[in-house]
Amino acid sequence: MKDLINNSIKHHSEALQLIDESVIINSASIVLDAIKKGKTIFWCGNGGSASQANHLSAELIGGMYQKKINPFKSICLNVDSAFITAWSNDDSFNNIFLRQLEALGA
């Protein structure tokens, strides 16, 4: 068990070294700029990433500040299970988020 944990830590540490921090900084700047301009942030994900997207969207709406500031415009596209299952059945799973963005005028 100890070897498994140590190997996991080693692999995660190696993966962290490969991250280009400029990509993270650029992404954060894009999100912050959109928030400052009053634009809506759209989130989406698949599987566990869908849960992450939902959480991030909820935080922007107000969870992280508990009403100390105005909420930010934030929509998580993967929470509409009725649409996702209907559209992927009737059309294609490949463009479920695109279709929602078209409907929302984004």
Language-model features and meaning:
Residues 1-19:
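Generic N-terminal amphipathic, Lys/Arg-enriched alpha-helix
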Residues 5, 24-27, 53:
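Hydrophobic packing residues in well-ordered alpha-helices of helical domains and bundles
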Residues 7, 26, 90-92:
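Generic structural microfeature
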Residues 19-37:
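A short, well-structured juxtamembrane/interface segment
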Residues 33-105:
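Glycine-rich, small/polar surface segments that engage phosphate groups of diverse ligands
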